[in-house]
């Protein structure tokens, strides 16, 4: 599967091995997790320069001018693009260590079932009320207001 995805142009990134919160984890935990990701996942998908922050949690918080030890360690491991979670287009180039900080949308089952505000964030791409199949997991419910015709 990985070979076919690569052949058809897919790019892989890391989301850490254990989905750890990078803003509250110790450097030692981040190092152990990163090693495990490189050994068990990176060895399959190949090198990547992209790290998608689990929970959207930046290791240096929201201060893009700060470059602490965890961020530096991750950069030393080859990561250059660091993507958090956000609803607007955001990017910052950190010229002191050659890194791009940006936000990304994360459409998933949770956002498909979110309230009107949440599904509004994705309305430029789709309307959750038109595409979600509620018969698959009927007991999960939704928080949005049904469409009126």
Language-model segment annotations:
Residues 1-8, 59:
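Active-site beta->alpha N-cap acidic-glycine motif
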Residues 7-10, 46:
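A short helix-to-beta-strand connector/capping loop
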Residues 9-12, 97:
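Sequence-level motif detector for i,i+2 pairs with an aromatic at +2
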């Amino acid at each position: 599967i990985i070979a076919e995805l690569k052949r058809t142009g897919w790019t892989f990134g890391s989301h850490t091995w254990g989905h750890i919160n990078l803003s509250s984890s110790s450097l030692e935990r981040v190092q152990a997790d990163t090693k495990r990701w490189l050994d068990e996942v990176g060895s399959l998908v190949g090198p990547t320069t992209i790290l998608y922050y689990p929970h959207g949690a930046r290791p240096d918080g929201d201060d893009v001018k700060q470059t602490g030890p965890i961020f530096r360690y991750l950069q030393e491991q080859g990561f250059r693009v660091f993507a958090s979670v956000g609803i607007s287009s955001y990017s910052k180039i950190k010229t002191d260590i050659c890194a791009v900080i940006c936000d990304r949308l994360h459409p998933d089952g949770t956002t498909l079932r979110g309230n009107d505000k949440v599904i509004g964030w994705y309305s430029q791409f789709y309307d959750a009320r038109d595409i979600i199949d509620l018969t698959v997991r009927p007991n999960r419910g939704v928080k949005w207001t049904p469409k009126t015709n």
